[in-house]
Amino acid sequence: MPIGVPKVPFRSPGEEDAYWVDIYNRLYRERLLFLGQPVASEISNQLIGLMVYLSIEDDTKDLYLFMNSPGGWVLPGIAIYDTMQFVRPDVHTICMGLAASMGSFILAGGEITKRLAFPHARVMIHQPASSFYEAQTGEFVLEAEELLKLRETITRVYVQKTGKPFWVVSEDLERDVFMSATEAQAYGIVDLVAVE
């Protein structure tokens, strides 16, 4: 029988009795957010909503985004990144396992000096992909133009967040580049590696 999402007791300030809430809702109240799946519209919208709500609730307390994601869709990932830049609280990004593709883009998007990877975390960068093989010729050309614009945007963000020259990032995005936590730190995707 599946366990489901664990529940934990929570007591609201000023209340005598605790009640049971799922663990993620309890952690959200502490401003701890989680991306533990591929990036898609649903999780993107949930994280955006949480970041906006928590920043309205208190714009002086930092947010912490824990990540273990193989990447996913480009536009939902860019939407998460843009929201991280938009909200007033600093967003710490913490890579716990894998931050690949859009996951590494979001990881790099944390507040500079507040991006962390666990010692055995892995990071992977590459260029955005598309499903050209399904498109007709006219659609193919339009999609290729859009993909080039997205690649340019992603490259510029990595340049800004890592301090690497444009040509280096552009060349590295040509293929899958896997990095250890210390290599990701040297590259500028994270600022710190947690100690074992």
From Swiss-Prot:
Any one GO cellular component localisation term in the record: endopeptidase Clp complex
GO BP: any one term: protein quality control for misfolded or incompletely synthesized proteins
An MF annotation (GO) of this entry: ATPase binding
EC number assigned by the record: 3.4.21.92
Main subcellular location of this protein, as a coarse class: plastid
Keyword rRNA-binding part of the UniProt annotation: no
InterPro entries named in the record: ClpP (IPR001907), ClpP/crotonase-like_dom_sf (IPR029045), ClpP/TepA (IPR023562), ClpP_His_AS (IPR033135), ClpP_Ser_AS (IPR018215)
Keywords, alphabetical: Chloroplast, Hydrolase, Plastid, Protease, Serine protease
Domain of life: Eukaryota
Catalytic activity, reaction form: Hydrolysis of proteins to small peptides in the presence of ATP and magnesium. alpha-casein is the usual test substrate. In the absence of ATP, only oligopeptides shorter than five residues are hydrolyzed (such as succinyl-Leu-Tyr-|-NHMec, and Leu-Tyr-Leu-|-Tyr-Trp, in which cleavage of the -Tyr-|-Leu- and -Tyr-|-Trp bonds also occurs)
Intracellular or extracellular location(s): Plastid, Chloroplast stroma
Catalytic residues of the enzyme: 101 (nucleophile), 126
Summary of subunit composition and partner proteins: Component of the chloroplastic Clp protease core complex.
Family: Belongs to the peptidase S14 family.
Protein name per the record: ATP-dependent Clp protease proteolytic subunit
Organism name: Panax ginseng (Korean ginseng)
